[in-house]
Amino acid sequence: MKTLQILCIMAIALSSISMQGQSGLRPPGDVNCDWEVNIADVNTLVDSILHGAQYDPFYSYATDVNHDKEINIDDISLLIHALQGEALPPMPSYSGTLPVLYINTEGHHDINSKEEYIHADWWLDAMGIEGVQPLGTPDEPLGMLIKGRGNYTWERSDKKPYRIKLDTKQSLLGMKKNRHFCLLAHDFWSNPVGFELSRRIGLAYTPAQEPVEVVLNGIYAGLYFITEKIRVDKHRVNVTEQQNGETDEGLITGGWLIEIDGHVDKNQFFILEDDGEVLPVKYHSPDSLSDEQMDYIYNLISQTDKAINEVSDSVWEKYIDLDTLACFYIVNEVVDDIESFKGSLYLHKHRGDSTKLLFGPVWDFGCAFGRLDYETPCFLYENTDDVYKPYWLEKLVQSGKFQEVVRKHWRQFYPSRMETMESYIDSLINRISLASEADRMRWPGQYWSRLESQNEYYKMRMREKVKFLNEQWGSQQ
């Protein structure tokens, strides 16, 4: 306590001195989030320590001046010496090789909810990159709403993903004008590669995404991918939109966007299968159901599930579009995504008499090449533990008709659409490598930013898997 008192006396003597931060970036020690360091920050830090303030991996970053992941008297000492003219330890900053998205929440409030949006200002600095259109400025920012998103990454990772809703439609980094986007924080290799495979095989819609560096409330947050939010829209999942609470039996047959995923959600129902397993179903559009809508979608998925488990082509083909299923399946086999038929499994349906569900779009390749015993390549449904046991897939692959459609799409896809994938991957890695290094400085020890080793390892795994798949599907049978 005596040391703390001495430091406070020293700080009072320096009360007229301040240090400015870079435009858009807070300097280390900016406890009060006013983009400068002065006596007020020292006072706030002292008060915080006396009241037992705890370190937070993101929001304490400018306050943890010596980067020891603690808020303590050492930080006060460094601040005071900085006001005397000594240099502070540098904070990680953006690489300057990608556009920078600045987001400042209202009142600089923390983003700590996946349910409640908070208001924020934003602007996009093109960083002089050719072909990139800047949006907004620090003096005239644009508006948005922002909240958390994700499951494992939100709950377990210090670096958080976000969902954003712009005040007005914008074309972000060349993507179609829209208000709804996600900021994906991880998987710099597997998500872009999985999405590119989806585009190449010809699924009707694949979310567009672009890399960007993010500064949140003046703190460098790292490398993110701005990604289109999956939603019903003429430029996204292009089905006729169904109104919330619709009761007309003709109108409730289509406009559906649903997801098979076990993470708990308020818009979710469960189907008990004959073997005692539970099939979890989320409904995204419409997202507020009348009794008629709930009865319709529940019965449709129940009938689909029952038909698949009976392993009768003539029955389950009534409910499943074979072409989209085959393309979706091939993409996930190529990247060996062991979670692909367990979570983030999107389905959609057009309006009309047809009862067929279409597979896609793809989303979340976080478990790509997640199998540890990979020395002998195998199919997704083989050698899988109970945690990743896929819904439906083991039954579907028993169908000769389905295998025939898979082989047809494989021969269209390989080798012509696959042969330049490694060039695409190398170009992607080259584009984001310096930003990935900056991200690694910001979030040391995290797996997703080790791009060089990831790239060679994943390409090796993909070559082996493609060779295996072509041996199974490439010849006429």
Please place each PLM-identified region on the residue numbering.
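Middle-to-C-terminal accessory/interaction subdomains
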Residues: 109, 142, 153, 157, ...
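Solvent-exposed, polar/charged alpha-helical surfaces in well-ordered, non-transmembrane soluble domains
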Residues: 40-43, 47, 74-77, 81, ...
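Conserved NTP-binding catalytic cores of kinases and kinase-like/nucleotidyltransferase enzymes
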Residues: 91-193
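Internal "kinase-insert"/substrate-recognition segments embedded within catalytic cores
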Residues: 163-165, 170-171, 185-188, 202-207, ...
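Cellulosome-associated attachment modules in secreted, modular CAZymes
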Residues: 8-13, 18-92
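Positively charged n-region of N-terminal signal peptides that target proteins for export
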Residues: 1-6
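Short, solvent-exposed loop/turn and secondary-structure capping segments
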Residues: 113-115, 134, 175-177, 224-226, ...
